[in-house]
């Protein structure tokens, strides 16, 4: 069996095209959607992610205000900037690129963002609303996974979903979304304390790999015909590349393609969907703040 490759880049491009039409409509009413992006330090991966996000914003007609702060920035300095952006009515969303330098507590930073501008969906208020099924900003990567499944026609009702990874950014919120009535899957979340992991993953109709370990999920951990969603983005050394590295996922891709019925690649799988959902959340924020919903 050769798995269908789920083209996240194409689906994300279609979504951005739809968003661009909505942006034109609200710009005609005098609203310019704007996202504040804060990058602390010079981490190359973070710089690359920020570039991808700002490029997507510009593509759909949104503005960004990017703040590049030195590695030595203190927590108080960052919180002061966030307070100013919270009060700025021309800023619809605030994104602080993670990870942050060790002297800054990421939880304190996330909690400082106005929940109405929390387009990442990480603020405790928005996490609570998500858990209760209330309307809120949905974390971008989990939302992107759900959108991919729906757009590719994957049947989720009654499906056994196994998520490997329990992070606050992906695993936990995705488990909630999978249980929602519009998805209606039966969910198992695996982690470092899970016993007999392969026995669990081989039960999955839909297997989501989100633990941040390169090629951790092997072909013998996948049920024949399962749909595999690879959330991982890992840099591994590759002397043949100009950059000196290449990106791989949490799934051992080529062997998995012989077992799965469909699979997301890395790159051009879940990653573009994450950015598209960030852009979508920024549009929602701009509409809400200007009474245009």
Curated annotation (Swiss-Prot):
Task: State the protein's purpose.
Answer: Catalyzes the oxidation of 5,10-methylenetetrahydrofolate to 5,10-methenyltetrahydrofolate and then the hydrolysis of 5,10-methenyltetrahydrofolate to 10-formyltetrahydrofolate.
Q: What is the lineage of its organism?
A: Bacteria, Pseudomonadati, Spirochaetota, Spirochaetia, Spirochaetales
Give the GO molecular function terms.
methenyltetrahydrofolate cyclohydrolase activity; methylenetetrahydrofolate dehydrogenase (NADP+) activity
Q: Does the keyword Amino-acid biosynthesis apply?
A: yes
SUPFAM superfamilies named among the record's database cross-references = Aminoacid dehydrogenase-like, N-terminal domain, NAD(P)-binding Rossmann-fold domains
**Residue numbers binding NADP(+):** 165-167, 192, 233
Alphabetically sorted, this entry's keywords are: Amino-acid biosynthesis, Histidine biosynthesis, Hydrolase, Methionine biosynthesis, Multifunctional enzyme, NADP, One-carbon metabolism, Oxidoreductase, Purine biosynthesis
Q: In which pathway does it act?
A: One-carbon metabolism; tetrahydrofolate interconversion
What is the protein's species of origin? Answer: Treponema denticola (strain ATCC 35405 / DSM 14222 / CIP 103919 / JCM 8153 / KCTC 15104)
Hey, which family's this protein in?
A: Belongs to the tetrahydrofolate dehydrogenase/cyclohydrolase family.
Q: What is this protein called?
A: Bifunctional protein FolD
């Amino acid at each position: 069996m050769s798995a269908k490759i789920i083209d996240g880049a194409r689906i994300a491009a279609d979504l951005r095209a739809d968003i661009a039409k909505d942006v034109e409509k609200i710009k005609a009413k005098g609203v310019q959607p704007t996202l504040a992006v804060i990058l602390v330090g010079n981490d190359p991966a973070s710089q690359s992610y920020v570039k991808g996000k700002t490029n997507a914003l510009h593509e759909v007609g949104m503005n960004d205000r990017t703040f590049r702060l030195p590695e030595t920035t203190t927590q108080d300095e960052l919180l002061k900037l966030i307070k100013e952006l919270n009060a700025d009515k021309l800023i619809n969303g605030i994104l602080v690129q993670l990870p942050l330098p060790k002297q800054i507590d990421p939880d304190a930073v996330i909690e400082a963002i106005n929940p109405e501008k929390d387009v990442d969906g990480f603020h405790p208020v928005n996490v609570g609303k998500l858990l209760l099924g209330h309307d809120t900003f949905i974390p971008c990567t989990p939302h992107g996974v759900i959108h991919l499944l729906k757009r590719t026609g994957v049947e989720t009702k009654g499906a056994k979903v196994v998520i490997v990874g329990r992070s606050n950014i992906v695993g936990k919120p995705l488990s909630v979304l999978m249980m929602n009535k519009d998805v209606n899957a039966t969910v198992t979340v695996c982690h470092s304390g899970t016993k007999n992991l392969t026995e669990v993953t081989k039960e999955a109709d839909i297997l989501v790999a989100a633990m941040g370990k390169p090629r951790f999920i092997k072909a013998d951990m996948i049920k024949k015909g399962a749909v595999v969603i690879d959330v991982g983005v890992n840099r591994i050394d590759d002397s043949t590349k100009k950059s000196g590295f290449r990106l791989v996922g949490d799934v051992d891709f080529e062997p998995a393609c012989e077992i799965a019925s469909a699979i997301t690649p890395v790159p051009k799988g879940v990653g573009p969907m994450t950015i598209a959902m960030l852009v979508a959340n920024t549009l929602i924020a701009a509409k809400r703040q200007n009474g245009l919903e």
